[in-house]
């Protein structure tokens, strides 16, 4: 069984699907990529059992399939190939004793590799999409990257709402119970509210600046440009009602400089003991914290005046300000000491929300 492909195209395709593979898996085949030649196409697949990456390139020759053994090493070798890549698959033995051996030849270079049987590879789920929409992959990824900090890593005990990217109408958002971040795009809207894990969406960068079709099945999401297909499981839960967490009215509004604010928070973080939770007391530009009965202070310039004293987690506020890195000013909207703190910037479609921390009475400075 023989087939011929363009070496560069094959190498690039193998690199793409390898991003879905597990580096160390209890099931060895999940560390490897499936290659299938059929109908003049070479289809490559990589999966970790949760996410599938599949792509195809033109091919000539017979129809056959195999699973790479030591995919990572094969991918390194393929990057050195140029021109026509010839792949030959030989079988030996029968039944449980059946073995595959793969020969790759390109120019004066050749290599013989063991291969797994394709029957050992997990089949991707069959989708019956009920809804679909089109979006630019690069634009969507940029929006996700701005807000994904407001998620937590998934564990068995973590609420799915806190680990996921939420899609609802023309908004995407994240929240972890202590903060939230969202972005609005009036040019498109999700046909139904849904949630996805954050990790698979990092693969959107493989599509570059292309428009992609997003297909929504009851349990899965498929994102494709017609050649590359990203398939992963949906989070089977109802997205959180973000509007219920956003204050509708604000008593005060001040402008801060993100760079200056982050620098002063970084100063306090470096000065205070590192094994403590950093609870910051903020009022009219004055920033104070107290750790182990020691008091630390600094201040920033405000455009506007604030009389509401609020408390917040230092790291959460730094993450929210980082969302607006590069902006000269950010508006901070306040309602009360116990209401969420809203951050936004002029001509930006994204927002951040930080939940306050209840403040204890602080002794007067010596």
Task: Walk through the language-model features, giving the residues of each.
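Structural preference for solvent-exposed beta-strand-turn elements
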Residues: 1-366
């Amino acid at each position: 069984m023989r087939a011929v492909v363009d070496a560069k195209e094959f190498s690039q395709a193998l690199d793409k699907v390898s991003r879905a593979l597990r580096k160390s898996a209890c099931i060895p085949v999940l560390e490897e990529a499936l290659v299938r030649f059929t109908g003049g196409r070479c289809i490559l697949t990589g999966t970790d059992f949760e996410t599938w990456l599949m792509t195809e390139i033109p091919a000539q020759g017979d129809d056959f399939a195999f699973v790479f053994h030591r995919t990572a090493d094969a991918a390194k070798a393929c990057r050195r190939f140029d021109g026509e890549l010839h792949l030959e698959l030989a079988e030996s033995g029968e039944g449980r004793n059946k073995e595959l051996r793969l020969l790759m030849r390109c120019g004066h270079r050749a290599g013989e590799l063991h291969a797994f049987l394709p029957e050992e590879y997990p089949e991707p789920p069959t989708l019956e999409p009920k809804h679909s929409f089109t979006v630019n992959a690069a634009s969507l990824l940029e929006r996700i990257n701005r807000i994904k900090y407001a998620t937590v890593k998934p564990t068995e005990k973590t609420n799915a709402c806190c680990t996921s990217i939420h899609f609802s109408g023309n908004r995407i958002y994240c929240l972890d119970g202590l903060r939230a971040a969202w972005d609005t795009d009036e040019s498109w809207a999700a046909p139904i509210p849904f949630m996805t894990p954050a990790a698979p969406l990092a693969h959107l960068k493989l599509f570059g600046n292309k428009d992609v079709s997003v297909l929504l099945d009851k349990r899965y999401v498929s994102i494709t440009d017609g050649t590359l297909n990203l398939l992963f499981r949906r989070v089977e839960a109802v997205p959180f009602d973000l509007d219920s967490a956003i204050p509708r009215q604000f008593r005060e509004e001040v402008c801060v400089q993100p760079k200056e604010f982050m620098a002063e928070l970084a100063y306090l973080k470096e000065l205070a003991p590192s094994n403590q939770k950093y609870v910051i007391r903020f009022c009219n530009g004055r920033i104070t914290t107290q750790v182990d009965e020691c008091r630390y202070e600094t201040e920033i310039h405000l455009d506007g005046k604030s009389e509401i004293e609020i408390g917040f987690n230092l790291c959460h506020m730094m993450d929210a300000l980082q969302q607006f890195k590069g902006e000269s000013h950010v508006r901070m909207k306040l309602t009360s000491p116990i209401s969420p703190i809203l951050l936004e910037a002029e001509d930006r479609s994204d927002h951040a929300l930080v939940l306050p921390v209840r403040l204890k009475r602080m002794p007067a400075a010596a």
